[in-house]
């Protein structure tokens, strides 16, 4: 098993020194889901929400969150992201919204946390915008789908 990179020999948390690492293209994809009633999902997809376009707001929130991950997660590095995408899909058969984020850069550390943060904050934004209509929505299944680049190589979740 790999060692924890953010813990030193004394067991103290620290930010990893990446100064000697080579710059490579790195990309990560993550997803999250928001479960809700059919009525709430229809309100979103039909554009009937009084606060406006829920998906557009969640998309912008996810993009902004990816850019600010280093301010939210204590040991993350500030990164110069070159791409952030947040896709939202209404899954009417299961009354869920699927959120997928993609982050990319050329740099010395990966973008997994940025992708996970983007998907998570987009989900939280959907909850925030719809909580007046439905308080028992469930945010879940937040996970890394794929990452490329860097020393640890390629990772892809099994389908």
Curated annotation (Swiss-Prot):
Source domain of life: Bacteria
Annotated keywords: Lyase, Molybdenum cofactor biosynthesis
Annotated GO MF terms: cyclic pyranopterin monophosphate synthase activity; GTP 3',8'-cyclase activity
Pathways per UniProt: Cofactor biosynthesis; molybdopterin biosynthesis
CDD domains listed in its UniProt record: MoaC_PE
Enzyme Commission code: 4.6.1.17
Binding site for substrate: 75-77, 113-114
Catalysed reactions, as listed in the record: (8S)-3',8-cyclo-7,8-dihydroguanosine 5'-triphosphate = cyclic pyranopterin phosphate + diphosphate
Active site per database record: 128
GO biological process: Mo-molybdopterin cofactor biosynthetic process
NCBIfam families xref list: moaC, PRK09364.1
Function statement: Catalyzes the conversion of (8S)-3',8-cyclo-7,8-dihydroguanosine 5'-triphosphate to cyclic pyranopterin monophosphate (cPMP).
Complexes and interactors: Homohexamer; trimer of dimers.
Stated name of the protein: Cyclic pyranopterin monophosphate synthase
